[in-house]
Amino acid sequence: MSKKILIMAGGTGGHIFPALAIANELKNHSTHIQWLGSNVGIENEIVPKHNIKLHTVNSVGLRGKSVVSLIKALFLLSYATLQIMGIFLKFKPNIVLGMGGFTSGIGGLVACIFRIPLVIHEQNSISGTTNKILNKIAKKTFQAFDDTFIKSATTSGNPIAFSSVDKQTNNKKLNLLIIGGSLGSKPINDISTQLNININIWHQTGRLHFDAVKAQYKNNVVKVTEFIKDMANAYAWADVVLCRAGAMTVSELMLSATPSILIPLPHAIDNHQFYNAKILADSNAGILIEQKDLTIELLEKTLLNINKNQIKQMSTNALKLAKPNAAKQIVNYLLSFD
C-alpha cells in the first residue's frame, strides 16, 4: 500500500519550490502525495500542473495586527484549523512534511493532535516563526544551513530543481545575470538599467516590471525577460549574478557554483536575507552590498574589479557550500517511517 504523505507549503516560492523538488523525488517511490496550501499563494497556479491534489484554506496573518483585526484573524484561524482537521481526517496521511508558512503552522499542530509524525524543513538561515514553534514538536527537523536551530537538526541544504550546472566558458566580456525573483525587484531593476560598462547582461525583471525595464535599456544587446524557466541554463551562462538573497536563490548559487553580488531585501522578516547573504560573503563566494549603500558608482566599480581569477575562486567556494542531495535525504527519511 502506498505511503500517504501530506506536504504543507504555501504563500511564496521560497516555501513552494523546495517542497516541489521533494514531491518530484517522492514520485520515484510508491507514495500518495497531497498538498496543503493557502488560497492566495502561487501554489494554486503551480502545484496542480504537477498532478498533485491541492487543498487550500484561507490564509490568516497575525503579525502587526491591530486589536480588532487580531480578533477577526483569530476567528478565521479557528475556521482554518477546522478545515485542516477535515482534510487530515479524509486523507489520513501517514506522515506530514511542513515547509513553513501559515498552513504549515496550523497543519503541524493538527498533526500533533492526531499523533501523526511531523517533519519540518527550514529554508532560511534565520528560522521563520512557524518553524520555531513546530521545531519543538517535530519528529525531525531539517535545515538548509548550519546553526539555524538550537535543538539538534540535520543540515540537508535546500532541495533544488536541478542537480548540477555545466558552466559555459566565456573568454570575452563578463556575463552578468540579474534576477529579482518571480515578482522582480524594483530597486535592482532601476539601478541595473543605469549600468554603462562593457559587459553582457541578461536581466530577469519580474512580470510587473518588464515593459518599464525594457524601455530603459538603451543597449539593445541586453537580454530582458520576465521570468526564467530554466534557471540551470541561466546560471550556466552567468559569470556573476546580481540578486536578492532569498534562501532558494542562495542555495542555487551554491549548487551552480556561481559568484554573486547580493543585495538583501532590507525589510525581510527578521532580516533573514542579510544572514542568508552573509553565508556566501563570509566564505568569499559572494559580495554583500546592503541596499542603503547601493549606488551605480559602487555597482560599476564592483563589477569592473571582478577578474577571472576571482570568479574562479568564488565559484569554487560557492560549490563547497552546496548540498546537492537535499531532496533525496529528506525523502529517504520520510520513507523510513512504517
Swiss-Prot record:
It is found in: Cell inner membrane. InterPro entries: GlcNAc_MurG (IPR006009), Glyco_trans_28_C (IPR007235), GlycoTrans_28_N (IPR004276). It is an enzyme of class 2 (transferase). UDP-N-acetyl-alpha-D-glucosamine binds at T12, G13, G14, N124, S182, I228, Q273. Pfam families: Glyco_tran_28_C, Glyco_transf_28. It catalyses: di-trans,octa-cis-undecaprenyl diphospho-N-acetyl-alpha-D-muramoyl-L-alanyl-D-glutamyl-meso-2,6-diaminopimeloyl-D-alanyl-D-alanine + UDP-N-acetyl-alpha-D-glucosamine = di-trans,octa-cis-undecaprenyl diphospho-[N-acetyl-alpha-D-glucosaminyl-(1->4)]-N-acetyl-alpha-D-muramoyl-L-alanyl-D-glutamyl-meso-2,6-diaminopimeloyl-D-alanyl-D-alanine + UDP + H(+). Pathway: Cell wall biogenesis; peptidoglycan biosynthesis. Keywords: Cell cycle, Cell division, Cell inner membrane, Cell membrane, Cell shape, Cell wall biogenesis/degradation, Glycosyltransferase, Membrane, Peptidoglycan synthesis, Transferase. One of its GO terms (cellular component) is plasma membrane. One of its GO terms (molecular function) is undecaprenyldiphospho-muramoylpentapeptide beta-N-acetylglucosaminyltransferase activity. Cell wall formation. Catalyzes the transfer of a GlcNAc subunit on undecaprenyl-pyrophosphoryl-MurNAc-pentapeptide (lipid intermediate I) to form undecaprenyl-pyrophosphoryl-MurNAc-(pentapeptide)GlcNAc (lipid intermediate II). This is UDP-N-acetylglucosamine--N-acetylmuramyl-(pentapeptide) pyrophosphoryl-undecaprenol N-acetylglucosamine transferase. The gene is murG.
